[in-house]
Amino acid sequence: MNALLLLAALSSQITFNTTQQGDMYTIIPEVTLTQSCLCRVQILSLREGSSGQSQTKQEKTLSLPANQPIALTKLSLNISPDDRVKIVVTVSDGQSLHLSQQWPPSSEKS
């Protein structure tokens, strides 16, 4: 097995399942954990564009199973080319587990 694939399989991670139709983006953050946990999930959405700024924050506590991707929420956003959008998802058990991931990745335009 490829070492990179093995490393990904052995580590907890947050990924984003994203689809786009025109300016409409559907973003589904998913978490895969190596151990089940009762975790605090925070989803922060920041947007800045010609019509102003907005910020939304969702927080919830979820019982997350191990070794399977779990969709945390579904976001549908109309993002015009001049908009700057950042979504940050954080999953923490308050002890040893703390994951955070941003969409879009910093290498993409935000």
Swiss-Prot record:
NCBIfam families linked: PRK10102.1
Family: Belongs to the CsgC/AgfC family.
Gene3D superfamilies: 2.60.40.2420
Keyword set includes Transcription: no
Superkingdom of the organism of origin: Bacteria
Organism in which the protein naturally occurs: Escherichia coli O1:K1 / APEC
Pfam families: Tafi-CsgC (PF10610)
Lineage, uppermost ranks: Bacteria, Pseudomonadati, Pseudomonadota, Gammaproteobacteria, Enterobacterales
Keywords attached to this entry: Chaperone, Periplasm, Signal
UniProt keyword Transferase present: no
Signal peptide (from-to): 1-8
InterPro entries to which the protein is assigned, alphabetical: Curli_assembly_CsgC/AgfC (IPR053722), Curli_production_prot_CsgC (IPR014491)
UniProt subcellular location: Periplasm
A cellular component term, taken from the record's GO annotations: periplasmic space
Identification of the protein by name: Curli assembly protein CsgC
Function comment: Plays a role in the extracellular assembly of CsgA into thin aggregative fimbriae (Tafi) fibers. Assembly may also require CsgE. Tafi are thought to be assembled via an extracellular nucleation-precipitation (ENP) pathway, and possibly also via an intracellular non-CsgC-dependent pathway.
